[in-house]
Structure formats: structure tokens, C-alpha cells
A protein has these predicted regions:
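AMP-binding/adenylate-forming catalytic core of the ANL superfamily
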Residues: 1-63, 72-75, 80-90
Length: 94
């Protein structure tokens, strides 16, 4: 099992990343793989490949997200918690 918070904590080490959430997406080979949904800090740039490579250097290969999607903001509920269900609806397709 891969715990999204563990992967998120690694990605948060990148100075360009303001927010990130990791969700599972269907995969024909593995059943499910990770996808990071990231918000960059204003004026910052980083590529999907750079985030994936950074993860490869810091966590086990099987935990590395297979893709990264960039968004302007993460959906949150009134308590301020990220609504991962909404992210899965928008970005959860393979």
C-alpha cells in the first residue's frame, strides 16, 4: 500500500510547490497508481518529469506518482480540508 500523505510530504519539499494532493487512478497493469495534483507557488515553474524524478530519489519506486497534473487551486471543504473525492472525479481517469 502507498499512503498519499507520505508521497505528498516528499513533494512538499520542492520549493516550487505550494500545495499537493495524491490520488489513485486506475492502471491496467497495477490496478491503481498515484497521480499528484499540484499547485505551484506564484512565479514558480517545475515540470511533471522533474517532480517524478525528485520522488524517485526520495521514496521507493512503487510509491512514485506516475503522473502530475497542475491546477490553480485544490478544492477544499468549509473546514479547509482538501476534497480528494472531487479530485478523483476530475483527474481520476487513466
Amino acid at each position: 500500500n502507498v499512503y498519499p500523505a507520505e508521497v505528498e510530504n516528499i513533494i512538499y519539499r520542492l520549493p516550487q510547490v505550494a500545495e499537493v494532493a495524491v490520488i489513485g487512478v486506475p492502471d491496467e497493469t497495477w490496478g491503481e497508481v498515484g497521480r499528484a495534483v499540484a499547485v505551484l507557488k506564484v512565479g514558480q515553474q517545475i515540470s511533471e518529469a522533474e517532480i517524478i524524478e525528485f520522488c524517485r530519489q526520495h521514496i521507493g519506486r512503487y510509491k512514485v506518482p506516475k503522473s502530475v497534473v497542475f491546477v490553480d487551486k485544490l478544492p477544499r471543504n468549509p473546514a479547509g480540508k482538501v476534497v480528494k473525492g472531487e479530485l478523483r472525479e476530475r483527474f481520476g481517469a487513466a
